[in-house]
Amino acid sequence: MKVVLQRVKSAQVTIDNQIVGAIKQGYVLLVGIENTDTAEDIMYLVRKISQLRVFEDESGRMNLSIQDIEGTFLSISQFTLLANTKKGNRPSFTGAGDPVFAEKLYANFNDQLRLYSGLDVETGQFGADMAVSLVNDGPVTILFDTHQK
């Protein structure tokens, strides 16, 4: 499982010009799921992301978690994170999870993130063509890969 985390001041996702999810301060999470991903991978990421201290404290140091600032999440499914670009110029997405499997794991990830963090989790729509807009904060961008824990 791969997740790209971006610290944001605000973000929203639209489908067919309709806003389906929006947040103020928090994280945008781009979530890529592989067929080998498990519930253990989900919980590893949920704990790491919820407890990650990348928000500034009163002295300007990255010392606060999203829970400390009572932020929110915008979670977006993104199979293209699993692109293989080793051969040729066209990416291969054979490493991405089967859509039925991936949709279930993505929903489980979002549910566990809500339960563990106690914070709101806005989402896009799995498999949809989405427009995501955001205002980066920092910028702070961190890549998580459960195959490299």
UniProtKB/Swiss-Prot annotation:
EC number: 3.1.1.96
InterPro entries associated with the record: Daa-tRNA_deacyls_DTD, DTD-like_sf
Keywords (A to Z) from UniProt: Cytoplasm, Hydrolase, RNA-binding, tRNA-binding
Subcellular compartments: Cytoplasm
EC class: hydrolase
An example molecular function term from Gene Ontology annotations: tRNA binding
Catalytic activity: glycyl-tRNA(Ala) + H2O = tRNA(Ala) + glycine + H(+); a D-aminoacyl-tRNA + H2O = a tRNA + a D-alpha-amino acid + H(+)
GO BP of this protein: D-amino acid catabolic process
GO cellular component: cytoplasm
Motif Gly-cisPro motif, important for rejection of L-amino acids: chain residues: 138-139
Pfam families named in the record: Tyr_Deacylase (PF02580)
SUPFAM superfamilies linked: DTD-like (SSF69500)
Similarity section: Belongs to the DTD family.
Role noted for this protein: An aminoacyl-tRNA editing enzyme that deacylates mischarged D-aminoacyl-tRNAs. Also deacylates mischarged glycyl-tRNA(Ala), protecting cells against glycine mischarging by AlaRS. Acts via tRNA-based rather than protein-based catalysis; rejects L-amino acids rather than detecting D-amino acids in the active site. By recycling D-aminoacyl-tRNA to D-amino acids and free tRNA molecules, this enzyme counteracts the toxicity associated with the formation of D-aminoacyl-tRNA entities in vivo and helps enforce protein L-homochirality.
PANTHER family: D-AMINOACYL-TRNA DEACYLASE 1, D-TYROSYL-TRNA TYR DEACYLASE
Domain notes: A Gly-cisPro motif from one monomer fits into the active site of the other monomer to allow specific chiral rejection of L-amino acids.
Subunit details: Homodimer.
Protein name in UniProt: D-aminoacyl-tRNA deacylase
Organism in which the protein naturally occurs: Leuconostoc citreum (strain KM20)
Record gene name: dtd
